């Protein structure tokens, strides 16, 4: 992937850096693999805001992605590489030999016309999905299962990959993109390679409107709110927060407070917390 830089012709193009979309091969998705995407705009079933700063944005159709990769030992050919408005990674359309079509996350260096497989005892080619116990140490993998047969749940964002560090007993040790080191069952499947669009972190929208197109609403500082809206609010002019430490809008400690549950079951499988 490459980044397209814009000259300052207008205020909206100043500091703009967007994807060049050079790897995209088609602009129309497979009709059988899209469905209506009901956007709740950060509200729950009662209409109460549960996630702030969401709303608006362009309409999107959801692409059905195959995270399970459970068509074992049936080869598929990469037919196209497409843009997905619901994620920052690209997706690849597969045509299986039995006639079925599926979308997967597009790995780097997987091209149109390549053949991939999923199952046990297969080759270690880019895009192939196989159990962690069959992947050699030092390999980069993505779309990793946490529980066998549940489908990939971690390492799915653009440009990410995990590295296999060790194998011992029924578990494989992986280093995740967050530098967290954790154990995962050896029967869990993972896909060889790194997720595509690894320059996504370089993208700059250049203007507020482009961020609104993505469905993101403005984030307002607590110090400029009223005291009924935020613990930092109120006062005459620019006043200090008036507290011993920064707080969230709900009065909980912010900036450095660990929020992970202390009795979470998966904590036993985390050898080193993320940095």
UniProtKB/Swiss-Prot annotation:
Residues 219-267 are annotated as: Disordered. PROSITE patterns: RIBOSOMAL_L2. It is found in: Plastid, Chloroplast. It holds the Pfam family Ribosomal_L2. GO terms for cellular component: chloroplast; mitochondrial large ribosomal subunit. One of its GO terms (biological process) is mitochondrial translation. The keyword Nucleus does not apply. Keywords: Chloroplast, Plastid, Ribonucleoprotein, Ribosomal protein. The keyword Ribonucleoprotein applies. SUPFAM superfamilies: Nucleic acid-binding proteins, Translation proteins SH3-like domain. Its main location: plastid. GO terms for molecular function: RNA binding; rRNA binding; structural constituent of ribosome; transferase activity. Signal peptide: none annotated. Residues 255-264 have a biased composition (Basic residues). Belongs to the universal ribosomal protein uL2 family. NCBIfam families: rplB_bact. Part of the 50S ribosomal subunit. HAMAP family: Ribosomal_uL2_B. This is Large ribosomal subunit protein uL2c. It comes from Thalassiosira pseudonana (Marine diatom).
């Amino acid at each position: 992937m490459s980044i397209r830089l814009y000259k300052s012709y207008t205020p909206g193009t100043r500091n703009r850096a967007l994807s060049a979309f050079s790897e995209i091969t088609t602009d129309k998705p497979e009709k059988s693999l899209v469905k209506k995407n009901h956007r709740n705009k950060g509200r729950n079933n009662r209409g109460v805001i549960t996630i702030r700063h969401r709303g608006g944005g362009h309409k999107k159709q959801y692409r059905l992605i195959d995270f399970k990769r459970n068509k074992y030992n049936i080869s598929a050919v990469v037919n196209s590489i497409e843009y997905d408005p619901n994620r920052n990674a690209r997706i690849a359309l597969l045509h299986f030999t039995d006639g079925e079509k599926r979308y997967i996350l597009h790995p780097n260096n997987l091209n149109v016309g390549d053949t991939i497989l999923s199952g046990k005892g297969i080759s270690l080619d880019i895009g192939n999905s196989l159990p962690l116990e069959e992947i050699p140490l030092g390999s980069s993998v993505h779309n990793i299962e946490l529980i066998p047969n549940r489908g990939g749940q971690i390492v799915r964002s653009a440009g990410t990959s995990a590295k296999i560090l060790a194998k011992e007993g029924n578990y494989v040790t992986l280093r995740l993109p967050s530098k967290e080191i954790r154990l995962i069952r050896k029967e869990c499947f993972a896909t060889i390679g790194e997720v595509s669009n690894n320059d996504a972190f370089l993208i700059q929208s250049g203007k507020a409107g482009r961020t609104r197109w993505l469905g993101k609403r403005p984030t307002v500082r607590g110090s400029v709110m009223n005291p009924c809206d935020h613990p930092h609010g109120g006062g005459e002019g620019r006043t200090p927060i008036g507290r011993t430490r920064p707080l969230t809008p709900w009065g909980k400690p912010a900036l450095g407070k660990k929020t992970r549950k202390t009795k979470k079951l998966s904590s036993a499988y985390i050898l080193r917390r993320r940095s």
